[in-house]
Amino acid sequence: LDSLFSERFEQNDLLAIGTSGNGLLVETSYYNPPMDFYDILEKIRKKGFHPVLAHPERYRYMDMKDYQKLKSMGVKFQMNLFSLAGSYGEETLRKCCMLLAEGMYDLGGTDTHNLAMFRRFVAEKKLSKEECKGLITLKK
């Protein structure tokens, strides 16, 4: 959610996701939210889209209070599967497990942008039995 997003949003130059075509995958900086973060999400909703926040577990500035506020606004959460495998460090893994345990995730995906990156992550990581169970029950 940056100035380029705002420009594209105003021009209706958006790439929606989902079977109904009204999901909008969004992300922010890992360290700071945009100044008008909640207002932007509300504008997205008013335009008929459902905001989907990519990898909420990776945002260092967020805590449970932030996650609960976002969920109360109707924002869906997409877990980065490699976060659950510990690829982004212990703090991200801890947040990922907490969000999973609270049933806050709606979708799963990866943040891999090419096949080489995917292969590296897959070769390095394994999930525990408990993590696999959590994924299986993810919004059945």
Model features per residue range: what roles?
Residues 122-140:
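Mid-to-C-terminal alpha-helical segments outside catalytic/metal-binding sites
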Residues 1-77:
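Extended substrate/RNA-proximal surfaces in nucleic-acid metabolism proteins
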Residues 105-120:
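Short acidic/histidine-rich active-site segments
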Residues 75-86:
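His/Asp/Glu-enriched short active-site or ligand-binding loop at hydrolase and phosphoryl-transfer sites
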